[in-house]
Regions:
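Active-site microenvironment for binding and transforming phosphate-containing groups
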Residues: 10, 15-255
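Methionine residue identity
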Residues: 1-5
């Protein structure tokens, strides 16, 4: 995968309210590969037990983009043909179960800004011009609204409140993790919907692992300032070359 050109998308959709929903929990940590109509995507088994939502993490398979964008590119800002990107959204939506005009896309700038999304935001950044910026997290309780965030190697965070029928998605790179955007998202859901953190179902999506994530000391200093010393040995280790290997997955688990 060309991480500079092909953008993967995290999709989470609030479906119609189902008032008799029961709480589900699972120890399942691995995503499953799904394929429909030639489109390949990933899902979480624990979320598939929830009739109130649909979700996916896209792959590069099943789209119409060509060359370095081949084939399921979902970014309008990388130089790909706009009509190809629109067709990719149509194909992904047909496979997963959403309409492109219901999608609300983030404008990720490594902040901890979390936006409350309403029905008036449908299509934002997808089928109509974007009306908000500097947004790395989104939450909603509006049925039919689709949240979309974008990734190369940063960490996708899913949030589902099956009690108050609400969802959230957040983009957590190292800056967002230091800023604890996961915690910010949960607090925002509590503020807006009355969500109880103990009742939330959360997940960490596909992203860079510790073995592949080398950082310099200035980044580690940020984590040392943000996290209690008792967690440091779980978050990073120093190598002989003076660099560090950083574990963003574990950092976000600690935040949750």
């Amino acid at each position: 995968m060309n991480m500079q050109m092909l953008v993967r998308v995290h999709i989470l959709k609030h479906k119609e309210n189902i008032m008799d929903i029961k709480w589900h929990s699972s120890d399942e940590t691995h995503m499953q590969v799904r394929e429909k109509n030639g489109v390949t995507f990933l899902t979480y088994p624990a979320f598939e037990n929830l009739p109130e939502i649909i979700h996916c993490f896209s792959t590069r398979l099943g789209g119409v983009s060509e060359g370095i964008f081949s084939s399921m590119n979902l970014s309008f800002t990388r130089g790909d043909n706009e009509n190809a990107v629109k067709e990719n959204y149509r194909r992904l939506g047909a496979a997963v179960g959403f309409a492109p005009e219901d999608v609300v896309s983030s404008d990720q700038t490594h902040t901890t800004n979390v936006r409350l999304v309403g029905a008036e935001d449908r299509g934002n950044g997808i089928t109509r011009p974007r009306t908000f910026h500097d947004t790395d997290g989104m939450i909603t309780n509006v049925p039919g609204v689709v949240l979309a965030t974008y990734y190369a190697d940063c960490v996708p965070l899913y949030f589902v409140d099956p009690v108050h029928h609400a969802i959230g998605l957040s983009h957590s790179g190292w800056r967002g993790t230091v800023g604890k955007i996961g915690k910010v998202t949960i607090e925002k859901m509590h503020q807006e919907f009355g969500s109880d953190p103990a009742e939330l179902l959360t997940a960490i999506g596909p992203s860079i692992c510790q073995d592949c994530y080398e950082v310099s000391e200035d980044v580690i200093l940020e984590f040392q300032n943000a996290f209690n010393e008792k967690y440091w040995n779980r978050l990073f280790y120093k190598k002989d070359n003076g660099k560090y290997q950083l574990n963003l997955w574990e950092a976000n688990r600690i935040i949750f």
